[in-house]
């Protein structure tokens, strides 16, 4: 029986006889003494075997190779001074193996080197195809253990300190297409009818509040059939919470305590409280988006009033058509950013135009306080306007001002993108900083120009601000998102709990009373039976762990992720199914495979 994990052994175990299990990470033959690095999920420890000291294990050690699975029994010994290894936690000790038992070998050539001693860069598609080998590597193994620690900390806080109940909600539910596409599951028992996999437990957790389960949480699996990005998966995990009889301030306070608990337990980091807050409007005005990275400056400054009446047509046309002009001050930008990068063909120009802008205007501030720019701008700015512009942007000699002009949404999107790119390129972002903040007071709705109707910005169960009930189309939502270093890690809201308000919201997004009853009648009916005030939040577990692990993709904190084409390279899912299975489900496929034509 195993007595210890490899990575847990220290000098405090000297003289103990231990039994370890693991994989051979590396084998070295040093003139009659064979050294093995034995690896398990906790780390690596050195095993030694020689014909003189450990004659029983030596013949087995001679035949071992990388990734063989073995059992080792031996005595923990102190390493000689010349072989100490400060790079690993077990570097002061080694195990002289009285016994080595080969449990399994490797019968195929390894697709890549698993050993932590090799720095081989492996293509992600190969890693995903052989994910069971990839997960043996220290980085991925540590990420999954970190994920476990985060979930454990969540559970302990919510259950032991805050009296929450963990309650499971259905995976097979009904389709309520609002937002992302559902994954559909045909019913064999009810031909022609379909289940949907849940995009979130939203409706069920609200019904649990109606049922009196006043503090609910769940580590929930969610499914969305949407176009994928680096931080999206078709199936993902969230910490889902709902609370009755709590206002927004109480919910935010509890969640700040939860996040602080997670960081303290998992990373031994004390986060300052309370977390800063910005309204949605403030965030858009200063950063151009609703998930700002506040670890650095380069904030947007609105200069529409100052520059909208100049003779420079790009600026005046933007303001006269209802748009805006905004600027970013880049300290020392005269030295760090050339004109070539700003003009057509440059990398910054490309970033801006990919975000929808037609180009970038710029002004360079010289040592004498004068400006240097393209003639059309300079010719249309008088001395007083230049002075006011420098005051508004706090620009100094040597600084560069970058401008966006046009419809406000495009200006915000393009300058927000430039801001992030410049923050990275200029080294303004502290990779170890942790900046958390709440974004509040979102709009209830946004206009879908394609479908010519309003859509809920979050979801249609979010409660409108009580001061804005007169005209819901312009109402603020009692919604809140938690943002960490420019990534939204959680979002929630107070919920509607009165039938008449919920019906009014459904009508605003274009649902007729009949459609609302057909899709959500069970919820509306529940509101007739004494529904308490309630609210909640959901955290993207994958994103949170990604940030804690300092990874760039959530695929590196998920055991078996899908690709950006929503496929599993390991199991080759999705895959075709037998026609007999489809017939049992009363389903027929209309897909016609494309015929490959040889050149």
From Swiss-Prot:
Pfam families: GAD, tRNA-synt_2, tRNA_anti-codon. It is an enzyme of class 6 (ligase). The record marks 30 as: Important for tRNA non-discrimination. SUPFAM superfamilies: Class II aaRS and biotin synthetases, GAD domain-like, Nucleic acid-binding proteins. The keyword Flavoprotein does not apply. Gene3D superfamilies: Bira Bifunctional Protein, Domain 2 (3.30.930.10), GAD-like domain (3.30.1360.30), Nucleic acid-binding proteins (2.40.50.140). It comes from the Bacteria. L-aspartate binds at residues 178, 224, 458, 495. Belongs to the class-II aminoacyl-tRNA synthetase family. Type 1 subfamily. NCBIfam families: aspS_bact, PRK00476.1. Aspartyl-tRNA synthetase with relaxed tRNA specificity since it is able to aspartylate not only its cognate tRNA(Asp) but also tRNA(Asn). Reaction proceeds in two steps: L-aspartate is first activated by ATP to form Asp-AMP and then transferred to the acceptor end of tRNA(Asp/Asn). Homodimer. This is Aspartate--tRNA(Asp/Asn) ligase. It comes from Synechocystis sp. (strain ATCC 27184 / PCC 6803 / Kazusa). The lineage of its organism: Bacteria, Bacillati, Cyanobacteriota, Cyanophyceae, Synechococcales. The gene is aspS.
């Amino acid at each position: 029986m195993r007595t210890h994990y490899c990575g847990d052994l220290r000098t405090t175990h000297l003289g103990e006889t231990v039994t370890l299990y693991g994989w051979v990470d590396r084998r070295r033959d040093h003139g009659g003494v064979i050294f093995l690095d034995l690896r398990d999920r906790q780390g690596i420890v050195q095993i030694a075997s020689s014909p003189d000291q450990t004659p029983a294990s030596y013949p087995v050690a001679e035949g071992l190779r990388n990734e063989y699975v073995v059992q080792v029994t031996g005595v923990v010994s102190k390493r000689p001074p010349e072989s100490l290894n400060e790079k690993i936690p077990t570097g002061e000790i080694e195990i002289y193996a009285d016994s080595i038992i080969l449990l399994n070998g490797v019968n195929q050539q390894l697709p890549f080197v698993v050993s932590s001693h090799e720095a081989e860069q492996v293509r992600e598609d190969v890693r995903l195809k052989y994910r069971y080998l990839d997960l043996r590597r220290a980085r991925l193994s540590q990420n999954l253990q970190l994920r476990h620690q985060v979930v454990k900390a969540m559970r302990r806080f919510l259950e032991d300190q805050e009296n929450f109940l963990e309650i499971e909600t259905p995976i097979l539910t009904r389709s309520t297409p609002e937002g992302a596409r559902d994954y559909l599951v045909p019913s064999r028992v009810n031909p022609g009818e379909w289940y949907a996999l849940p995009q979130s437990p939203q409706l069920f957790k609200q019904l649990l509040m109606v049922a009196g389960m006043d503090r609910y949480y769940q580590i929930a699996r969610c499914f969305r059939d949407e176009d994928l990005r680096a931080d999206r998966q078709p199936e993902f995990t969230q910490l889902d919470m709902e609370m009755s009889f709590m206002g927004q301030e109480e919910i935010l306070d509890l969640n700040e305590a939860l996040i602080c608990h997670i960081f303290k337990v998992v990373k031994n980091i004390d986060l300052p409280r309370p977390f800063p807050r910005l309204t949605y409007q403030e965030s858009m005005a200063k950063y151009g988006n609703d998930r700002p990275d506040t670890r650095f400056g380069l904030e947007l400054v609105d200069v529409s009033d100052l520059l909208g009446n100049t003779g420079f047509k790009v600026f005046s046309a933007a303001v006269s058509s209802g748009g805006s002009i905004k600027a970013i001050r880049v300290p020392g930008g005269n030295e760090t950013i050339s004109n070539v990068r700003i003009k057509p063909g440059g990398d910054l120009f490309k970033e801006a135009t990919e975000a929808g802008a037609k180009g970038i205007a710029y002004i360079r501030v010289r040592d004498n306080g004068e400006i240097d720019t393209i003639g059309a701008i300079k010719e249309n700015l008088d001395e007083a306007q230049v002075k006011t512009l420098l005051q508004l942007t706090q620009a100094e000699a040597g600084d560069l001002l970058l401008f966006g002009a046009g419809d406000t949404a495009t200006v915000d999107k393009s300058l927000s993108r430039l801001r992030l790119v410049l923050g990275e390129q200029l080294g303004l972002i502290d990779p170890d900083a942790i900046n958390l903040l709440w974004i509040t007071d979102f709009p209830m709705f946004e206009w879908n120009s394609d479908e010519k109707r309003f859509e809920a910005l979050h979801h249609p169960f979010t409660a409108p601000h009580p001061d804005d009930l007169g005209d819901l189309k312009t109402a603020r939502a009692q919604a809140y998102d938690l943002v960490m270093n420019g990534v939204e890690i959680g979002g929630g809201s107070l919920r509607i709990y009165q039938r008449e308000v919920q019906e009014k919201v459904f009508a605003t997004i274009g649902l007729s009373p009949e459609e609302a009853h057909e899709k959500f009648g069970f919820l509306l009916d529940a509101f007739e039976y004494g529904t308490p005030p309630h609210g909640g939040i959901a955290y993207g577990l994958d994103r949170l762990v990604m940030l804690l692990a300092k990874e760039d993709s959530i695929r590196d904190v998920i055991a078996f992720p899908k690709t950006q084409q929503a496929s599993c390279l390991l199991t080759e899912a999705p895959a075709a199914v037998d026609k007999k299975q489809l017939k049992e489900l009363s389903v027929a496929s209309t897909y016609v495979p494309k015929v490959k034509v040889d050149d």
